[in-house]
Amino acid sequence: MIYILGTGGNMPTKYRQTLSIFVNYMGKGILFDAGENTQRQMRLLNLSPTQIDYIFLTHIHGDHILGLPGILLSLSNQDYNRELTIFGPKGIKEVIEKIIDSFAININFPLKIKEIGETKIDFGPFYIESIYGIHQVPVLAYSFKEKDKIKINKEKLAKYNIRSNPKLAKLKEGKSVTINGITLDPKEFTYIQKGLKFTLITDTLFREQFIDFARDSDIIFHELAFLDKDKDKAIEHYHSTISDAFRIRDESNSKLLVFIHVSPRYQGSLFEIYQYLYNKKDWIIAEDLDYIEYKKGTIIYKRNDIVLYEYAIWRS
């Protein structure tokens, strides 16, 4: 599950909290950014900060980290029995240590703070990759990738009346096996089941490198900070435009474009945004508390339990 907790940029408004996205994958909780009121947003979705194992911060600006002091304080006051690891760009360690010291937070659980650059971190069934953006302070974009799986083609096996056999495990290792006098070639009797990939890009100027970084994403979460008519302001403040987002999505062969970090300046003129988006396909302007289910290879984007978008990345 992917929970879009906060979708605003710069400051909270009566419509949007600032950015945070929580992912619950195979029992691991991953929080991307911790905008103001992240805890409250989690509780509105019946989630708890105690479910967090990893926090990935894009950068140290307040609208992306002001929820962090409260999270650390809550974990210190609750029965949190996990190890928390916080990742972020250079400078994040000093900031977090000052937060802990300034708020006199008694950290009574294992806490690791890791400053990273462009890297790929393996978490077993998935990995998270990072790449630098261009902003007033060091900023990272992130990509979550569920590892592809080698699956046995049961339909083809059924044609040879082969249903189950311990030797079939060898096929997944790329080895030929002989069953009932029939030699099975792994190239013919196995296939790759694609893993989920999503990419988060926010608070950065456009970079050509983002296209390869986001390659074949099922979802791209991208900031909606400036329209094209305000491109000069976007460059001045080190942000991307709405056209930059579509360029990354289209040229990277990615699917669903979800806009987050929506600027308060456009809240009263959403009609202008929708005019631009009228002839575009596969996009959603996220709202707080939207969530994405991932079941049997199908992505289901929901708002208030209503399905807005459904897309199968593989079929069983």
Swiss-Prot record:
Q: Which co-factor is required?
A: Zn(2+)
Q: How is the cofactor bound?
A: Binds 2 Zn(2+) ions.
UniProt key word Acyltransferase? no
Kindly list the GO molecular function terms attached to this UniProt entry.
3'-tRNA processing endoribonuclease activity; zinc ion binding
User: What CDD domains does its record include?
Assistant: RNaseZ_ZiPD-like_MBL-fold
Which NCBIfam families is this protein grouped with? PRK00055.1-3, RNase_Z
Q: What does this protein do?
A: Zinc phosphodiesterase, which displays some tRNA 3'-processing endonuclease activity. Probably involved in tRNA maturation, by removing a 3'-trailer from precursor tRNA.
- Record-given protein name: Ribonuclease Z
Source species of the chain: Nanoarchaeum equitans (strain Kin4-M)
